[in-house]
């Protein structure tokens, strides 16, 4: 995922996912945030990434696999754990939030 950054907004009742594209030394938003479980964040992210036909399928699958891991962790145990633990578990993901 070196060309892309998975960003996660970690909240008490929801988790939200977005993707940025790495541009030079910074990044540029590629998608908006999609919320789980309020909406189907994974499906929304998949649909949005598929619209960007210039993203290689291998990269798209890698992003979606990491999104799946983050959502599963949040559902199973993460929402009851501090944000610092999520950051340690997924060092390649950019986290922000209040939980």
UniProtKB/Swiss-Prot annotation:
GO terms (BP aspect): translation
UniProt entry tagged with the keyword Ribosomal protein: yes
Pfam families in alphabetical order: PSRP-3_Ycf65 (PF04839)
Keywords, sorted A to Z: Ribonucleoprotein, Ribosomal protein
One GO CC term on file: ribonucleoprotein complex
Gene3D superfamilies per record: 3.30.390.140
Molecular function via GO: structural constituent of ribosome
Entry-linked InterPro entries: PSRP-3/Ycf65_sf (IPR038447), Ribosomal_PSRP3/Ycf65 (IPR006924)
Superkingdom of origin: Bacteria
Family to which the UniProt record says this protein belongs: Belongs to the chloroplast-specific ribosomal protein cS23 family.
NCBIfam families: PRK02724.1
Oligomeric form and interacting partners: Part of the 30S ribosomal subunit.
Record function comment: Probably a ribosomal protein or a ribosome-associated protein.
Protein name: Probable small ribosomal subunit protein cS23
Organism of origin: Acaryochloris marina (strain MBIC 11017)
Organism lineage: Bacteria, Bacillati, Cyanobacteriota, Cyanophyceae, Acaryochloridales
